Amino acid sequence: DRDSCVDKSRCAKYGYYQQCEICCKKAGHRGGTCEFFKCKCKV
């Protein structure tokens, strides 16, 4: 789910969010972005 993406998809310092994006999409969201090194899913 959405919260597990935050734990699983740590974001690199310079905005590498491929894992975050994939995790969020699998959880049924439109994608994800990185904020403060954490993955945030778009609704």
Curated annotation (Swiss-Prot):
Key word Disulfide bond present: yes
Family per record: Belongs to the ergtoxin family. Gamma-KTx 3 subfamily.
GO molecular function: potassium channel inhibitor activity; toxin activity
Record localization: Secreted
PROSITE patterns registered for this protein in UniProt: ERGTX
InterPro entries assigned to the protein according to its UniProt record, in alphabetical order: Ergtoxin, Scorpion_toxin-like_sf
Cysteine disulfide links: 5-23, 11-34, 20-39, 24-41
Gene3D superfamilies on file: Knottin, scorpion toxin-like (3.30.30.10)
Superkingdom of origin organism: Eukaryota
Name of the protein described by the UniProt record: Potassium channel toxin gamma-KTx 3.2
Keyword terms, alphabetized: Disulfide bond, Ion channel impairing toxin, Knottin, Neurotoxin, Potassium channel impairing toxin, Secreted, Toxin, Voltage-gated potassium channel impairing toxin
Function per UniProt: Blocks Kv11/ERG potassium channels.
Keyword match Disulfide bond: yes
Tissue: Expressed by the venom gland.
Domain comment, as recorded: The presence of a 'disulfide through disulfide knot' structurally defines this protein as a knottin.
GO CC terms of this entry: extracellular region
